[in-house]
């Protein structure tokens, strides 16, 4: 049987950042169960699509969520990131 999930790693990373905006990429990856390298790639994807903004906080990065960005075709044009985060309890 093929392994699948309801929420992609992109959604899980977005949720992890929402709950822990000052965490390192390594810590975020550990929360989700993926490598630090994969986490960096997903963070870049989320930043490129406008879901998050990354800023420096000392030697670390801090992340801000842009909850009004549409989720795209999967959830319909009107669904926003804030609805997904709300469903996940964040």
Residue ranges and their predicted role:
Residues 47-57:
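A short, conserved structural fragment
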Residues 43-44:
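Short, hydrophobic-biased segments on the C-terminal half of alpha helices
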